[in-house]
Amino acid sequence: MKITPVKALTDNYIWMIQHGNHAVCVDPSEPSPVLEFLVRNRLMLAQTWVTHPHPDHEGGAAALWRGYMESPVYGESDIEAATHTVTAGTQFTFGDGQVTVWATPGHTDRHTSYLLETSDGIHVFCGDTLFSAGCGRVFTGTIEQLYDSFQRFNRLPENTLFYPAHEYTAANLRFAAHIEPDNADIQTALKAAAHTPTLPVTLAHERRVNPFLRVDLPHVRDRAEALSGKTLNSSLDTFVALRELKNQYRTK
């Protein structure tokens, strides 16, 4: 199994998963990069997975299905191009891997992550829920949903690999350094982020640099209190405050 990021639009990644001469594409924002990848590598499109109904994630799905009409499009019922509707707990296979659908709302009220389990571990295609060193903005979901989705991710094995759909790592790390200026892991990651792609990332790495996975730490809560001017009584409060601070943050 080989997993490759294909750049699209401004900062999107369409993840291509290869097994033999077949491939899956995840969140095809536009069809042309996928078609070029398939032709260049002499692959047939076997499946398409869509995490949520934003144009930069599902925009190319319908065109790809028209070109490969035997290739199913997986997504929740609000994905217009979906030919195979999924819900939390849906399972199917690709190659020698087992795919399980998780509901990971927050960015949107219905957001799917696809967990691909293979002999070398768990691969999570998480759309706009988790980014390296950050999290998605809240649009039609709620911040409480997003917090719960992060808590669920955090219970996975530490070698789990995450495949977000955007290359936001450098900007997220600058905010993370604003929250934890003495965190050496963040400074090291910032230097490495000059070389893209920075993805995928392990859960172990994210636990060291992602402030939204570090809300249980007293010094993170104290910093969020100082910057927000609010009293934070729980990890959820800290998560909410960090998201609000990130919304307002501008790199100097």
From Swiss-Prot:
Zn(2+) 1 binds at H52, H54, H107, D128. It catalyses: an S-(2-hydroxyacyl)glutathione + H2O = a 2-hydroxy carboxylate + glutathione + H(+). One of its GO terms (molecular function) is metal ion binding. InterPro entries: Clx_II_MBL (IPR035680), Glyoxalase_II_hydrolase (IPR050110), HAGH_C (IPR032282), Hydroxyacylglutathione_Hdrlase (IPR017782), Metallo-B-lactamas (IPR001279), RibonucZ/Hydroxyglut_hydro (IPR036866). Zn(2+) 2 binds at D56, H57, D128, H166. Binds 2 Zn(2+) ions per subunit. Transmembrane segments: none annotated. GO terms for biological process: methylglyoxal catabolic process to D-lactate via S-lactoyl-glutathione. Pathway: Secondary metabolite metabolism; methylglyoxal degradation; (R)-lactate from methylglyoxal: step 2/2. Its cofactor is Zn(2+). Keywords: Hydrolase, Metal-binding, Zinc. It comes from the Bacteria. Its EC number is 3.1.2.6. The keyword NAD does not apply. It is an enzyme of class 3 (hydrolase). Belongs to the metallo-beta-lactamase superfamily. Glyoxalase II family. Thiolesterase that catalyzes the hydrolysis of S-D-lactoyl-glutathione to form glutathione and D-lactic acid. Monomer. This is Hydroxyacylglutathione hydrolase. It comes from Neisseria meningitidis serogroup B (strain ATCC BAA-335 / MC58).
